[in-house]
Amino acid sequence: MASVMQKLITPLCSGPQRPRNKVTVVGVGQVGMACAVSILMRELADELALVDVIEDKLKGEMMDLQHGSLFLKTSKIVADKDYSVSANSRIVVVTAGVRHREGESRLNLVQRNVNIFKHIIPQIVKYSPDCILVVVSNPVDVLTYVTWKLSGLPKHRVIGSGTNLDSARFRYLMAEKLGIHSSSFNGWILGEHGDSSVPVWSGANVAGVNLQKLNPDIGTDADKENWKDAHKMVVESAYEVIRLKGYTNWAIGLSVADLAETLIKNLNRIHPVSTMVKGMYGIGDEVYLSLPCVLNNGGVNSVVNMTLTDEEIAQLKKSADTLWGIQKDLKDL
């Protein structure tokens, strides 16, 4: 006797097709789920996979999202601790790792996270050899370098979320002070995500009007208007949010979805993300730092050569030296 399904539906082809825009999120903590939800709300993926080592939490998050399927445009949401669930992903977002502690420098997190990545990265590449890896775990620049080394993927397909969020914070804070929307203030934070990030005051502008021409001292100690406080707030803001609510997640989730959209839709938009910078601005070591990168469906397509001041280049080199000082001592890469 035919089943209800057999009576209702006449199949015309065999089996489901491979997903075209599958996204996997590794780590279902606060940041991972903020990334997942932000990507779902932007309708970027035709399949979302979640991977974590904590099975109950993983299953619970998957079920919770599946129950909202009516309100989403992503037809398939799956999860498993086995990385085979991530097979055929276009983008894999890595948020796994030990959490940033209140008052802890991002750089102190490195060694605690490297050993975790030794298990994660080879598994991702095994099942999705053609994917673009987007690293979010902190300290993101060093861990993006670690991911590149462990993955064996070309450098343009290993990207760190970098200063995309720092720049967004900077644009928000500067725009608030100017009474305009953050999208109307153009400013870049480059270098290391976090403590030694580099504000490019020489390029800060509104509607093409360079702020440094209006105030030659902007961003310096000589500036009577103290605009440099905006960058100070960018550096301190993550620590402040962690102090207040215990973690940061929503802004980074939105930032990662923004990157995912550019990658999936082949938009060729420019984002400040962490990429291999050896040979640029006089940097001689293999380090990942944020520069303005043109992103498309192949990953980092190119890097924009910004006209930086000598001081800004010096700060960028200092960032590189700081990171290399840690990277050179890492084992088993």
Curated annotation (Swiss-Prot):
Residue numbers binding substrate: 106, 138, 169, 248
Q: Where does NAD(+) bind?
A: 29-57, 99, 138
What is a GO molecular function of this protein? L-lactate dehydrogenase activity
Q: Name one GO biological process term.
A: lactate metabolic process
Membrane-crossing residue ranges in chain numbering: none
Tell me the pathway. Fermentation; pyruvate fermentation to lactate; (S)-lactate from pyruvate: step 1/1
Per UniProt, the keywords (alphabetical) are: Cytoplasm, NAD, Oxidoreductase
The annotated active site, in chain numbering, is 193
Superkingdom of origin organism: Eukaryota
Disulfide bond sites: none
Record field: catalytic activity: (S)-lactate + NAD(+) = pyruvate + NADH + H(+)
> Sorted alphabetically, which Pfam families does this protein's record hold?
Ldh_1_C (PF02866), Ldh_1_N (PF00056)
Q: What is its EC number?
A: 1.1.1.27
- List the record's Gene Ontology CC terms alphabetically: cytoplasm
What residue ranges carry the coiled-coil annotation?
Answer: none
CDD domains for this protein: LDH_1 (cd05293)
Q: Where in the cell is it found?
A: Cytoplasm
Entry-linked InterPro entries = L-lactate/malate_DH (IPR001557), L-lactate_DH (IPR011304), L-lactate_DH_AS (IPR018177), Lactate/malate_DH_C (IPR022383), Lactate/malate_DH_N (IPR001236), Lactate_DH/Glyco_Ohase_4_C (IPR015955), NAD(P)-bd_dom_sf (IPR036291)
Give the record's subunit note.
Answer: Homotetramer.
What the protein does? Answer: Interconverts simultaneously and stereospecifically pyruvate and lactate with concomitant interconversion of NADH and NAD(+).
- Name the family the entry cites: Belongs to the LDH/MDH superfamily. LDH family.
Name assigned to this protein: L-lactate dehydrogenase B chain
The protein's organism comes out as Anguilla rostrata
Q: List the top taxonomic levels of the source.
A: Eukaryota, Metazoa, Chordata, Craniata, Vertebrata
The protein's gene is named: ldhb
